Regions:
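Anion-binding and metal-coordination hotspots
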Residues: 1-301
Length: 301
């Protein structure tokens, strides 16, 4: 039906070895002789500016393979590190059918970015736009959730949230968001505002972009009986709000529904397809090198 889709990625070992690699302080792509380089190295140079490979992150890998430099050195399996590519699946959960496949570097930024690529490609080729997208926490960043909500796709995805506190004091979740007045309301009923004045120049006011800071009045917090539960070490309480916080709240609200429980079960169908790929088809290690070789093998499998 194409209404409920799920996405995930799995590591596939590349045809590369640590013995034939260079540490990051000895690797320089600018020194590679393109004329004498093999196909896999030329493809690496061609994809340095692509979001799925070279441009996914400015951080250089710890090691780079001479034979397949586009592969990613990773220890994501909690064991010995190895060179790999990520096989990204977009599936229709109602029928367990793979709708699209994309090969990327084995880092979260590239895997999450492939989601946008595959959803746009499926829309262009098959005119499919899912009602919901199911994924794990790796895909729960603010920009990703905002991208989905803007396209009217319900994010059935756990939110990456580091606002929780372990010392027993109130976290951001304990404060109520008042969208109409652009402020937070604390459990004691006091307002935390971003600005407490009207600017004659609109360019100095709130922009709605980046991280916004909301703060209570100092004398209000000092006289509050709940200050030990709120901000025991600060003069007043401050809360930050991300640019895509509205989309994150949409995802949090979805997580409380019964439909989310159904989606959590449907997500397992992606893992079943990866198990079939590795155990039945035996694709635990790639035979071809380079981004194109990895993509071709993933498509054929």
């Amino acid at each position: 039906s194409g209404q409920r889709m799920a996405i995930d990625a799995s590591l596939i070992e590349a045809d590369a070895n640590k013995q034939y690699s260079a540490p990051k302080d000895e690797w320089d792509a600018a020194r590679v002789d393109r004329g004498a380089a093999p196909r896999a190295v030329k493809e690496y140079l061609d994809t340095l500016d692509e979001a799925a490979f070279g441009a996914a992150t400015p951080v250089q890998p710890k090691f780079t393979s001479f034979s397949d430099p586009a592969s990613q050195w990773t220890a994501a399996r909690k064991g010995p590190a190895f060179f790999s590519y990520s096989d990204n699946y977009l599936i229709d959960t109602d029928h367990g059918v793979i709708v699209d496949v994309e090969a990327t570097r084995s880092i979260r930024q590239a895997e999450v970015g492939s989601t946008k690529t595959m959803l746009d490609r499926v829309k262009a080729k098959f005119d499919l736009r899912p009602e919901r997208l199911i994924a794990d926490t790796a895909y729960g960043s603010g920009p990703m959730l905002g991208w989905l909500v803007d396209r009217k796709i319900a994010p059935h995805i756990p939110v990456i949230d580091k606002a929780g506190r372990s010392d027993g004091t109130w976290s951001r979740a304990d404060f109520e968001w008042d969208a109409k007045n652009n402020q937070y309301i604390c459990p004691e009923g006091e307002a935390l505002k971003q600005f407490r004045r009207n600017y004659s120049d609109p360019n100095r006011g709130p922009t709605g972009k980046g991280v916004a800071k909301y703060q209570a009045l100092k004398h209000t917090c000092q006289a509050c009986p709940s200050k030990p539960k709120c901000c025991p070490k600060a003069d007043c309480r401050k809360i930050t709000r991300e640019e895509h916080e509205d989309a994150r709240e949409v995802a949090r609200a979805i997580r409380k529904t019964d439909q989310y429980k159904v989606s959590a079960k449907l997500r397992k169908k992606v893992e079943m397809l990866f198990a079939h790929l590795k155990r039945i088809l035996g694709l635990g290690r790639l035979r071809l090198r380079g981004p194109c070789g990895a993509n071709d093998e993933f498509l054929l499998a």
